[in-house]
Amino acid sequence: KNSGYKIYDNYVYGFNIGDLVSTIKDKLNNNLIMIKNGQDIISTGTVFNLNNQEYIAVLYGDINGDGKINSADLLKMRQHLLGMIELTGPFKKAASIVNGTSINSADLLRIRQHLLGIKNITQ
């Protein structure tokens, strides 16, 4: 069954902000075995096991891993761009919104546009 999710290097893309673990389990015919962050909401960094393979969820714009896109994510991206922190793993991937490879001012602009309701970030 095609779930609509994309998998690259054990990272899974295509979740929507607010998706629940229970909803995902239904979409995947209950083949989702284990969630490691213990929340019911899917967020960047959620680790799960599907068919004996471990995967990590990535939600574009959810840079701090709380399952939302908000000013905290904007701050994390700003700090990364200024060299104050270094985003790694799924959080770095969640921040590369525009081209999926690097993080730059265009990604910062996309989060601002999302927060202002000008243009939503698509997963």
Where are these regions (language model features)?
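Cellulosome-associated attachment modules in secreted, modular CAZymes
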Residues: 2-123
